[in-house]
Amino acid sequence: MENVCFQQRLRDLETRVRKWKFLKLGLTEVRLRPRDRRSTSVDQKHKECSSTSSSPQHQRPNNIGYLTSPMERKFTPLSMKPSPSRRDTEKDALEYEFLEGYKKSGTLEIDGEKQVVDPNEIHIISLLGSGSCGVVESATVRSKLMAVKTMYKNDNKENLKRILRDVRIMSMCNSPFIVTSYGYFMFDSSVKICMQIMSACCEKLLRRIYHSKLDFFPEFVAGHIVYSAISALDYLKEKHSIIHRDIKPSNILFDDSGNVKLCDFGISGFMTDSMAHSKSAGCPPYMAPERLTIETNSKYDVRSDVWSLGITVYQLVTGLYPFPLNDMEFTTLTIIANLNLPSPSLREETKRSFSPLFIEFLDLCLRKDVRERPEYRQLMKHDFYLDYDPASGSAYKFKAINGKCNQVADWFVDVIRLSKTEDELKSIPNTPCVN
C-alpha cells in the first residue's frame, strides 16, 4: 500500500511540474482523453490511497495527461536560428531596401536619357581617391566621362546604412550645388554610384598650395565656396529635410569651370521637426561644440553644419586648423566643446588681411553657443553672402561667362599648373587627417 501511495504522490508531483512548465512557457495544455492514456503498472483498483496513509488524500483528475510516459522519448535537435520575435528587424529592413534598390540597378540617366547599362560597359581609367568606405575612380560609360564610387558591403548595419543613404540622397537631389548622380549598380558585395566627375576637392588643393608655397585660398574664392555650400545645405534642408553632418575640406569639390559642389552623403540624416538625433555621425575635429557636449548631444540642428563650414573656410584661408592638435584628440575636442574658451577668429590673423565683412561672417559661423549661431537663411541675408550671390543684383562681385566663374576658374587653373600632383598625398602640420 505504501508503494501505491508513493506512486500516487509521484503522479501528483508530475502533474504540478507539468502545469508549471506549461505556464512558464506560455503553452496550451494538451489533455488526453481517458481512452488515449496509457496505463502504468499501477492497477486501477489502487488509484486511491488508503485513508490510513500519512499523506493527504488527492483525487486525481480524470482527464489530465502525463508529462512523462513509459514510452521511449524522442530527442529533437536544438535549433540555433533566432525565433521570429528575436529577429533583427532593423537589418531585415535594410536588406529589403537593398532588394528594392536592385530594381533600378543599372539604369543610368546619360545626357538626359535613361539607359539600361551593363556593368561591363564601365571602363575604369584611373584612381581619383580612396577612403574608409571605398574608392572613387574616373571611368567612361558609353563614351560619357564620369566618376564611379565603389562602396563595399559587409554585415555591419552601419556600413549598410551609409551605403543606402548615399545612394538614396544622391538619387533624389537635383541642385547645381550638389554633385549629380547618373545612377548606380548594386552587386552582392558592393555598390557603385556613377556621378558627375569633378576636378579636385578643397583638401587636395590645400595640400598642393601648402607644399608649393603658394598663397592660401583668397577671400573671393572663400566667398564663392561659402555661397555654394550654404546654397547646397539650404536646399537639402528645405527640400528634403536633410542635414549633411560631414562638412569638411574633402567633401567640397571644384570643377575646371570654378563651380563648387558638395558630395558624400553617407552619414547625412533626415531630420524630425528640424532636429537630428544621431550622436556619432561626422568627423570629430569639424563637429560643433553642441555635438561634443553630453548634455546637448542627443539633439542638434543645421547650425552644427554652419560651424563645420566655418572651421573649413578658416582652414582654407589660413592654411591651418584653428585648434591645437596632438596625440590626444580628446584634448582638442574638449577645447572645442568648452564654451568658456574663445572661438577662432580671423581678427587674430596677422599674416593676411581680410575684409571686415568676411571676418564678421566667419565669426557668426564660429559662435560656440549654438543659440547665438545663425541658421542658413539668416546667413543668406548677410552682406558677405550677397556679394557672391548672382541673384543679389548689383552686389554680385562676379560675372559668369558661358557658365564659367572666370576669377575662380582662373585661380583654380593656376593652382593646378603651379603645384604638383604628388603633393596631394602629403599631409599638412596641425591639420586633421580625415577621409
UniProtKB/Swiss-Prot annotation:
Transmembrane segments: none
EC numbers for this chain: 2.7.12.2
Composition bias type Basic and acidic residues, residue spans: 35-49
Domain called Protein kinase: residue spans: 122-385
Cofactor(s) this protein cannot do without: Mg(2+)
Gene3D superfamilies: Phosphorylase Kinase, domain 1, Transferase(Phosphotransferase) domain 1
GO molecular function (one): protein serine/threonine kinase activity
Residue numbers binding ATP: 128-136, 149
Enzyme class label: transferase
Tissues of expression: Expressed in most neurons, including nerve ring, head ganglions, dorsal and ventral nerve cords and tail ganglions.
Catalytic activity: L-seryl-[protein] + ATP = O-phospho-L-seryl-[protein] + ADP + H(+); L-threonyl-[protein] + ATP = O-phospho-L-threonyl-[protein] + ADP + H(+); L-tyrosyl-[protein] + ATP = O-phospho-L-tyrosyl-[protein] + ADP + H(+)
Sequence similarity: Belongs to the protein kinase superfamily. STE Ser/Thr protein kinase family. MAP kinase kinase subfamily.
Function description: Dual specificity protein kinase which acts as an essential component of the JNK signal transduction pathway. May phosphorylate jnk-1. Plays a role in coordinating locomotion via D-type GABAergic motoneurons and in regulating synaptic vesicle transport downstream of adapter protein unc-16 and probably by activating jnk-1. Positively regulates lifespan. Upon environmental stress such as heat stress regulates daf-16 nuclear translocation probably by activating jnk-1. Regulates germline cell apoptosis in response to heavy metals such as Cu(2+) and to arsenite.
Protein name (database record): Dual specificity mitogen-activated protein kinase kinase jkk-1
Species whose genome carries this gene: Caenorhabditis elegans
Lineage: Eukaryota, Metazoa, Ecdysozoa, Nematoda, Chromadorea
